[in-house]
């Protein structure tokens, strides 16, 4: 007599990786997606600037830095100033 075939569960579906945002809300004028980050990896610097109120912020970066890190540094600097 032969064995019964075992029913295997299908492999789990992988979740799609969502890319991180490149544009952010301005903490000064509260416009949505008005701040754009420009990163210069050669000089290890980054600048974020609002296209509406023209506020900007410069910071140093490292190899692992992403635009969201620059935005968080800007928000932290705003909170520490107040």
Curated annotation (Swiss-Prot):
Chief localisation class: nucleus
Positions that bind Zn(2+): 26, 29, 50, 53
GO BP annotations listed: transcription elongation by RNA polymerase II
One matching Pfam family: Zn_ribbon_Elf1
Taxonomy, superkingdom: Eukaryota
Protein known as: Transcription elongation factor 1 homolog
Organism taxonomic ancestry: Eukaryota, Metazoa, Ecdysozoa, Arthropoda, Hexapoda
Subcellular localization, as worded in the UniProt entry: Nucleus
Family membership: Belongs to the ELOF1 family.
Keywords of this entry: Metal-binding, Nucleus, Transcription, Transcription regulation, Zinc, Zinc-finger
Cleaved signal peptide residues: none
Keyword Transcription regulation on entry: yes
Cellular component terms (Gene Ontology): transcription elongation factor complex
């Amino acid at each position: 007599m032969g064995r019964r075939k075992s029913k295997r569960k299908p492999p789990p579906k992988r979740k799609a990786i969502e890319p991180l945002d490149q544009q952010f809300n301005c903490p000064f004028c509260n416009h949505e997606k008005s701040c754009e980050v420009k990163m210069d990896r050669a000089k290890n610097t980054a600048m974020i600037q609002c296209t509406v109120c023209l506020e900007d912020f410069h910071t140093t970066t490292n190899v692992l830095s992403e635009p969201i890190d620059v935005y968080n540094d800007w928000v932290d600097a705003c909170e520490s100033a107040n």
